[in-house]
UniProtKB/Swiss-Prot annotation:
The basal body constitutes a major portion of the flagellar organelle and consists of four rings (L,P,S, and M) mounted on a central rod. One of its GO terms (biological process) is bacterial-type flagellum-dependent cell motility. It is found in: Periplasm; Bacterial flagellum basal body. Keywords: Bacterial flagellum, Periplasm, Signal. Belongs to the FlgI family. This is Flagellar P-ring protein. GO terms for molecular function: structural molecule activity. GO terms for cellular component: bacterial-type flagellum basal body, distal rod, P ring; outer membrane-bounded periplasmic space. Residues 1-19 form the signal peptide. Assembles around the rod to form the L-ring and probably protects the motor/basal body from shearing forces during rotation. The keyword Signal applies. InterPro entries: Flag_FlgI. Its main location: periplasm.
Length: 365
């Protein structure tokens, strides 16, 4: 009896773990962020700003700012500034953002500044694609990196030419919203999936009545909603908390060709195959031989002749058997048995897919 109850509890937990809320799988069409961008100046740097002789736009921007403050710089003045840097400022305007609300901004150096650590961003207007100002940014920059240099040597950890200002911008203009207008809303799946779209529509129809949700395509589910903002908010809140059973994912292997990382999901399977992988290494060693005359006054000359030695080695290449694997653990165990490096594993997986032994989509990023 105890074993039966334990098995039943385990089954229920496993079943519940496969269910997810609709809000985690979809988003409401039209409810999205909007990108903002601006150009500004960072001051207060400890000698790590732009070299103004090489970045004339920094000096021009500073002159324009000073003229707006009533300060006139004589024409032709060569200002040797080290504590100022020209930067680009980016931010995201959240959906339903209201005037007075604060948002985070990212500050990135545009010139040849060495570091933005300790700098202060001066008031910078942030514009949208329509060239309208939607927010104003200003504040002290937090840089996550660190660095030091002395005597021709330098040490740097992480990036110093970019930083972030938490709540560094204030929204000054609101975006018009179409939410609450009309009797339909579209839910968009995060990943296109016909079966998942149909399952979400069926779940909504069972709770809200037949015809409440209609699948338009593999990513979009159209939902009939009551009119009015408050009614639609309550309706969406109920729908987004509904749970649906997640269908199995498509088997996929993602390869990052720049970093050499290989990631695969649990749906990946292997068929039996044989793999031979040989490693070829080429070593080039070059030395300079100096030949000098034995007699200092014999009229001979010192001759430098390069000597190059090339060593080519090939290892491995034996044929190894890869067993059919139906679970992710077995797939990992089979691939590890090959003893291949991540870079070698990329070509092996591509060859496996071409041979029909890798039951997965191969995506190279």
């Amino acid at each position: 009896m105890i074993k039966f109850l334990s098995a039943l509890i385990l089954l229920l937990v496993t079943t519940a773990a496969q269910a997810e809320r609709i809000r985690d799988l979809t988003s409401v069409q039209g409810v999205r962020q909007n990108s903002l961008i601006g150009y500004g100046l960072v001051v207060g740097l400890d000698g790590t700003g732009d070299q103004t002789t090489q970045t004339p736009f920094t000096t021009q921007t500073l002159n324009n700012m000073l003229s707006q403050l009533g300060i006139t710089v004589p024409t032709g003045t060569n200002m040797q500034l080290k504590n100022v840097a020209a930067v680009m400022v980016t931010a995201s305007l959240p959906p339903f953002g209201r005037q007075g609300q604060t948002i985070d901004v990212v500050v990135s150096s545009m010139g040849n500044a060495k570091s933005l650590r300790g700098g202060t961003l001066l008031m910078t207007p942030l514009k949208g694609v329509d060239s309208q100002v939607y927010a104003l940014a200003q504040g002290n920059i937090l840089v996550g990196g660190a660095g030091a240099s002395a005597g021709g040597s330098s040490v740097q950890v992480n990036q110093l030419n970019g930083g972030r200002i938490t709540n560094g911008a204030v929204i000054e203009r609101e975006l018009p919203s179409q939410f609450g207008v009309g009797n339909t809303l579209n839910l968009q799946l995060n990943d296109e999936d016909f079966s998942m779209a149909q399952q979400i529509a069926d779940t909504i129809n069972r709770v809200r009545g037949y015809g409440s949700a209609t699948v338009l395509d593999a990513r979009t589910i159209q939902v009939r909603v009551p009119s009015g903002n408050s009614s639609q908010v309550r309706f969406l809140a109920d729908i987004q908390n509904m749970q649906v059973n997640v269908t199995p994912q498509d088997a996929k292997v993602v390869i990052n060709s720049r970093t050499g990382s290989v990631v695969m999901n649990r749906e990946v399977t292997l068929d039996s195959c044989a793999v031979a992988q040989g490693n070829l290494s080429v070593t080039v060693n070059r030395q300079a031989n100096v030949s000098q005359p034995d007699t200092p006054f014999g009229g001979g000359q010192t001759v430098v002749t390069p000597q190059t030695q090339i060593d080519l080695r090939q290892s491995g290449g034996s044929l190894q058997s890869v067993r059919s694997s139906a679970s992710l653990n077995n797939v990992v165990r089979s691939l590890n048995a090959l003893g291949a490096t991540p870079m070698d594993l990329m070509s092996i997986l591509q060859s496996m897919q071409s041979a029909g032994c890798l039951r997965a989509k191969l995506e190279i990023i």
